[in-house]
Amino acid sequence: MHRFALVAVAILFSAVLPTTAAAAAPATADRVTARVDGHTYVLLGPSVFGVTVQQDPLAYSAVKLSDGTVRGHWSYHYYEAGVETTFSGPISCLTVHGDRAWVGGPITQSSDPAQIGSGGWWQIADNGIGPHPVIPDRTTFVGIGTLEQTQAYCDTAPEPRFIFDVQQGGVRVSAG
């Protein structure tokens, strides 16, 4: 009789454990549908905007999951006429078409407290790898406005008004 009870308990556990484990595991794992990484430096003399401006650097890394969730972080060191302003925060929007990406997120830290709570956005073009690709990677400077403008930038994926060759560093854009 004791042997029968042990067999019955073993059968019971073998039937219950797989369903318990299946219930504990997520039904589906969100897969990565897009990824961007970059660390870019750009220096422009006064002939472009009337004053020397420098992106030194714009650094970011983000992924977009199949459920639309975007995860990542960005930081930006911007110099205008030698005066540095810093911005950083999470990345909340990302759109990828081919080798181009539109990226943005809220400013949660800045050396200019008036910018905290605003949004920042930029566009990049991944033109290959290596220290000297035939066509360099390209980036815009960061635009700053409302969080609604930031999301609209990613949603509409506009052509850039100004986009510049990355002089040092690089970008990586991938879908899937």
Please provide the spans of the model-predicted regions.
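Tryptophan-anchored aromatic micro-motifs
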Residues: 28-50, 105
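Predominantly extracellular/secreted and cell-surface proteins with exposed
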Residues: 47-124
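Short, low-complexity, Pro/Ser/Thr/Gly-rich segments in the mature regions of secreted, periplasmic
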Residues: 165-176
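Generic low-complexity segments that are intrinsically disordered, proline-rich and/or Lys/Arg-biased
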Residues: 3, 19, 27, 47, ...
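Short, surface-exposed loop and linker segments with low hydrophobicity and enrichment for Pro/Ser/Thr
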Residues: 21-33, 63-68
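Extracytosolic low-complexity repeat regions of secreted or lipid-anchored proteins
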Residues: 100-165
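Secretory targeting and sorting signals
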Residues: 1-25
